[in-house]
Amino acid sequence: MSADENNLIWIDLEMTGLDPERDRIIEIATLVTDASLNILAEGPTIAVHQSDAQLALMDDWNVRTHTGSGLVDRVKASTMGERDAELATIEFLKTWVPAGKSPICGNSIGQDRRFLFKYMPELEAYFHYRYLDVSTLKELARRWKPEILAGFTKQGTHQAMDDIRESVAELAYYREHFIKL
């Protein structure tokens, strides 16, 4: 398949916390959809190696969540650093979307972009400057039509690929039930 500038790149990161000055990326996953939200391909899901010292900085929520999902063990066992994960992700994306064309897509994606800017700047630059943030629609629905929210439930596994799939499904749900096309 040739790269299509209308395809959308969806991304999710798991981090050791929310502060890019202190915390680090521990998992990255991407997938590509067409403009109609049909999933075309899933990219690599990569546990990003971090030192024991870095992992020790996690707060209780992150320790509990990422240990429970098995991510901490995968991070410790991983041989891929941030740069390797960045390059593998870009290599996957080149097949599906030309550089600079897709907005960065996901849930609360501004937070992920802050970490990409700091730790994976080449990948961050691969995206268009625009955002397709599903959480914007969630916040609007909460204020304008709160009953809509009951129709979509997330599993909340805090595993990157699961979270991306849920983001795509959530946007499709809002397209059907909230946005008048």
UniProtKB/Swiss-Prot annotation:
UniProt cross-references to SMART domains, sorted A to Z: EXOIII
One of the record's GO cellular component terms: cytoplasm
Location of this chain's protein in the cell: Cytoplasm
Coiled-coil residues: none
Enzyme Commission numbers on file: 3.1.15.-
Signal peptide span: none
Pfam family, one: RNase_T
All copies of domain Exonuclease, residue ranges: 8-171
Disulfide partners: none
A GO term for molecular function: nucleic acid binding
UniProt KW Lyase keyword: no
Function as written in the Swiss-Prot or TrEMBL entry: 3'-to-5' exoribonuclease specific for small oligoribonucleotides.
The family this protein is said to belong to: Belongs to the oligoribonuclease family.
NCBIfam families noted in UniProt: PRK05359.1
Protein's recorded name: Oligoribonuclease
Annotated organism of origin: Salmonella typhimurium (strain LT2 / SGSC1412 / ATCC 700720)
Gene for this chain: orn
